[in-house]
């Protein structure tokens, strides 16, 4: 049984109206002083761990008593978590620190269903909590021989720059379905019940400007990164996504790419470095670069709908604020783009709060995604199947003994539906994480009313003629593995060949880019791909655009004939500086009889597969 530590916070209510104090978050105009005093409930003589698995803090905020419940975030670090920095002469130094007994927690306020908390308990209490809809920050005061802490509202931190700060993503990514109206985006409990968690293994990179900004203090940088990712992890839990930090690299000697204020250039360079360098050294799903330089007119930029892509599963974030919460929200926003989420429109909502995917940072940073964001994220996951986030790190990669009640199915558990108060699974005993008597299953696509679905029940629909439907076996709650027809098998009446469960043909790609009444262009249009200019090429090698050979022209930029009303464009193409790959002919597309596109070449099907 987990021993609970009860810590009483004695609050000297000195609100200091009209005065100010300089804290880590900046200049604060209105704050309260608290003095933490631990009152332990451990038996006399018991060995107290350095950082408990669960704690409660009792404190007063604005004169009212509150109880803060905290649980250690055991999904924060991976088992093979590594840290890399560089010696003055450029040597790579990689270590694997012991992070089992860390001091980073998530939490909530008792009797406040909408409350959240993200707290570091390493040296006092530092972080944020939301109480009755308002965001509070807490941090220890740096006074000798004192346990004093400051508690203050985010709104009372002076903002140095009141100019509107924007995300650099300007073009929406189109999913397979049009965005539904807000009234159609209700996420039901039944939908949530069968949405399995996804796991993003995150790698952070810190540039030289950040090192200079922090006077070369690498430990200070590391601590800040831990606190930021702890908050990102908290934010994504409500999207049924766990974010685990698998690595941190600090460019302590020099930048490994040229970091420029032009965000598009820097993002492209970082993506290329990740693909050619970082991925060869460390397995991960997504990489984010934090920089202390001022990006031109933006505070972040990321590729959209790119999670798991070797180059484009990346984002860049400006270290815009001293408040970790603000930077964490920016990181969650840019990673949201990687997960297929666009900026929110006017009909998107997250209750009475601002939403994370607003194009600009809100006056008070939100920790909530909108209904639109939830739909777009899971639409991307279910339709595009970014496979790298399917693997569950727990048990092998994430340091975490089984914990009943954390909503993760771990070794020795038959089910895990959360705490007894929150469990909505009628098949599962929340107190023991065992199935209730008479239940065969508690989750899975082949589990209905706690029983295995009948043999032959469809559990995964066909997405194309290259992807047959899967059916339940009657012996398991899990749907059988997703099986595709063999790559290269003819499909769509020989207009295409199967490729990873799809039947890619140029007509469909033109439709996805431009809509109805748009078709594959005449062969003469594709000859433009022999130019090797900014749009007409077949592939990139070492950053250089390689012109197509005559036999490969249909494996470069896609050209479409637009017959829609008012249009007469026989060689319409799509090009964007932010995503040069979008608008290229997709891999596996038929380019001639018996031939398909592979790495910018038109090759025999037998050679490709």
UniProtKB/Swiss-Prot annotation:
<dbReference type="GO" id="GO:0004222">
    <property type="term" value="F:metalloendopeptidase activity"/>
</dbReference>
<dbReference type="InterPro" id="IPR006586">
    <property type="entry name" value="ADAM_Cys-rich"/>
</dbReference>
<feature type="binding site">
    <location>
        <position position="403"/>
    </location>
    <ligand>
        <name>Ca(2+) 2</name>
    </ligand>
</feature>
<feature type="disulfide bond">
    <location>
        <begin position="417"/>
        <end position="423"/>
    </location>
</feature>
<dbReference type="InterPro" id="IPR018358">
    <property type="entry name" value="Disintegrin_CS"/>
</dbReference>
<feature type="binding site">
    <location>
        <position position="337"/>
    </location>
    <ligand>
        <name>Zn(2+)</name>
    </ligand>
</feature>
<keyword id="KW-0800">Toxin</keyword>
<keyword id="KW-0479">Metal-binding</keyword>
<feature type="disulfide bond">
    <location>
        <begin position="491"/>
        <end position="503"/>
    </location>
</feature>
<feature type="disulfide bond">
    <location>
        <begin position="466"/>
        <end position="498"/>
    </location>
</feature>
<feature type="disulfide bond">
    <location>
        <begin position="348"/>
        <end position="372"/>
    </location>
</feature>
<feature type="binding site">
    <location>
        <position position="343"/>
    </location>
    <ligand>
        <name>Zn(2+)</name>
    </ligand>
</feature>
<feature type="domain" description="Peptidase M12B">
    <location>
        <begin position="198"/>
        <end position="393"/>
    </location>
</feature>
<feature type="signal peptide">
    <location>
        <begin position="1"/>
        <end position="20"/>
    </location>
</feature>
<dbReference type="InterPro" id="IPR002870">
    <property type="entry name" value="Peptidase_M12B_N"/>
</dbReference>
<feature type="disulfide bond">
    <location>
        <begin position="459"/>
        <end position="479"/>
    </location>
</feature>
<keyword id="KW-0865">Zymogen</keyword>
<feature type="binding site">
    <location>
        <position position="201"/>
    </location>
    <ligand>
        <name>Ca(2+) 1</name>
    </ligand>
</feature>
<keyword id="KW-0106">Calcium</keyword>
<feature type="disulfide bond">
    <location>
        <begin position="308"/>
        <end position="388"/>
    </location>
</feature>
<feature type="disulfide bond">
    <location>
        <begin position="404"/>
        <end position="433"/>
    </location>
</feature>
<feature type="disulfide bond">
    <location>
        <begin position="441"/>
        <end position="447"/>
    </location>
</feature>
<feature type="disulfide bond">
    <location>
        <begin position="446"/>
        <end position="472"/>
    </location>
</feature>
<keyword id="KW-0482">Metalloprotease</keyword>
<dbReference type="InterPro" id="IPR001590">
    <property type="entry name" value="Peptidase_M12B"/>
</dbReference>
<feature type="disulfide bond">
    <location>
        <begin position="525"/>
        <end position="571"/>
    </location>
</feature>
<feature type="disulfide bond">
    <location>
        <begin position="415"/>
        <end position="428"/>
    </location>
</feature>
<keyword id="KW-0732">Signal</keyword>
<feature type="disulfide bond">
    <location>
        <begin position="350"/>
        <end position="355"/>
    </location>
</feature>
<dbReference type="Pfam" id="PF00200">
    <property type="entry name" value="Disintegrin"/>
</dbReference>
<keyword id="KW-0645">Protease</keyword>
<keyword id="KW-1199">Hemostasis impairing toxin</keyword>
<feature type="binding site">
    <location>
        <position position="285"/>
    </location>
    <ligand>
        <name>Ca(2+) 1</name>
    </ligand>
</feature>
<keyword id="KW-0325">Glycoprotein</keyword>
<feature type="active site">
    <location>
        <position position="334"/>
    </location>
</feature>
<dbReference type="InterPro" id="IPR001762">
    <property type="entry name" value="Disintegrin_dom"/>
</dbReference>
<feature type="binding site">
    <location>
        <position position="388"/>
    </location>
    <ligand>
        <name>Ca(2+) 1</name>
    </ligand>
</feature>
<dbReference type="Pfam" id="PF08516">
    <property type="entry name" value="ADAM_CR"/>
</dbReference>
<keyword id="KW-1217">Cell adhesion impairing toxin</keyword>
<feature type="binding site">
    <location>
        <position position="483"/>
    </location>
    <ligand>
        <name>Ca(2+) 3</name>
    </ligand>
</feature>
<feature type="binding site">
    <location>
        <position position="416"/>
    </location>
    <ligand>
        <name>Ca(2+) 2</name>
    </ligand>
</feature>
<comment type="similarity">
    <text>Belongs to the venom metalloproteinase (M12B) family. P-III subfamily. P-IIIa sub-subfamily.</text>
</comment>
């Amino acid at each position: 049984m987990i021993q609970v530590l009860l810590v009483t916070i004695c609050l000297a209510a000195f609100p200091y109206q009209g005065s100010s104090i300089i804290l880590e978050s900046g200049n604060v105009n209105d704050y309260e002083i608290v003095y933490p005093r631990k009152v332990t409930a451990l038996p006399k003589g018991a060995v107290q761990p350095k950082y408990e698995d669960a704690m409660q803090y009792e404190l007063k905020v604005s004169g009212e008593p509150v109880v803060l419940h905290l649980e250690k975030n055991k999904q924060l670090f991976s088992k093979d978590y590594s840290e890399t920095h560089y010696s003055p002469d450029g040597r790579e130094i990689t270590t694997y620190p012991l992070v089992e007994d860390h001091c980073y927690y998530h939490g909530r306020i008792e009797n406040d269903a909408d409350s959240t908390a993200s707290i570091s308990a390493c040296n006092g209490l530092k972080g944020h909590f939301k109480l009755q809809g308002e965001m509070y920050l807490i941090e220890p005061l740096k006074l000798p021989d004192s346990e004093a802490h400051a508690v203050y509202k985010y709104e009372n931190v002076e903002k140095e720059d009141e100019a509107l700060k924007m995300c650099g993503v300007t073009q929406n990514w189109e999913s397979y379905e049009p965005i539904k109206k807000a009234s159609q985006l209700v996420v039901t409990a039944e939908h949530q019940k069968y949405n399995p968690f996804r796991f993003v293994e995150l790698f952070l990179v810190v540039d030289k400007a950040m090192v200079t900004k922090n006077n070369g203090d690498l430990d200070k940088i590391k601590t800040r990164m831990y606190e930021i990712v702890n908050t990102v992890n908290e934010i994504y839990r409500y999207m049924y996504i766990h974010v685990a930090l698998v690595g941190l690299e600090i460019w302590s000697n020099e930048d490994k790419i040229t970091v420029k204020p032009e965000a598009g250039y820097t993002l492209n360079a970082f993506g290329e470095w990740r693909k050619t360098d970082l991925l060869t050294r460390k397995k991960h799903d997504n990489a984010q670069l934090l920089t202390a330089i001022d990006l031109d007119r933006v505070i972040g930029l990321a590729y959209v709908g790119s999670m798991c892509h070797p180059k484009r599963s990346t984002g860049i974030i400006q270290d815009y604020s001293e408040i970790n919460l603000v930077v964490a929200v920016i990181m969650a926003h840019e990673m949201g783009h990687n997960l297929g989420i666009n900026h929110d429109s006017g009909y998107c909502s997250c209750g009475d709060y601002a939403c994370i995917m607003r194009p600009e940072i809100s006056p008070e940073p939100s920790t909530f995604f909108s209904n639109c964001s939830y739909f777009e994220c899971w639409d991307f996951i279910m339709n595009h199947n970014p496979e790298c986030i399917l693997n569950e790190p727990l048990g092998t990669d994430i340091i975490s003994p089984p914990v009943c009640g954390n909503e993760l199915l771990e070794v020795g558990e038959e089910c895990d539906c959360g705490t007894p108060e929150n469990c909505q699974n009628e098949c599962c005993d929340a107190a023991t994480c065992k199935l209730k008597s008479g239940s065969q299953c508690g989750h899975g696509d082949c589990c209905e009313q706690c029983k295995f679905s009948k043999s032959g029940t469809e559990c995964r629909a066909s997405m194309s003629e290259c992807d047959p439907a899967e059916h339940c076996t009657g012996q398991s709650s899990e749907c059988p593995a997703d099986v595709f027809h063999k790559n290269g098998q003819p499909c769509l009446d020989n207009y295409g060949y199967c490729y990873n469960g799809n039947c890619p043909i140029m007509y469909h790609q033109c439709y996805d880019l431009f809509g109805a009444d748009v078709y594959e262009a005449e062969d003469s249009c594709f000859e433009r791909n022999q130019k090797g200019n900014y749009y007409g090429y077949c592939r990139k090698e070492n950053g250089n655009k390689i012109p197509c050979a005559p036999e490969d022209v249909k494996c470069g930029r896609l050209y479409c004939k637009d017959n829609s009303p008012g249009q007469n464009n026989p060689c319409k193409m799509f090009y964007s500086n932010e995503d040069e790959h979008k608008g290229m002919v997709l891999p596996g597309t038929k380019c001639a009889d018996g031939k398909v596109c592979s790495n910018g070449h038109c090759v025999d099907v037998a050679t490709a597969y």
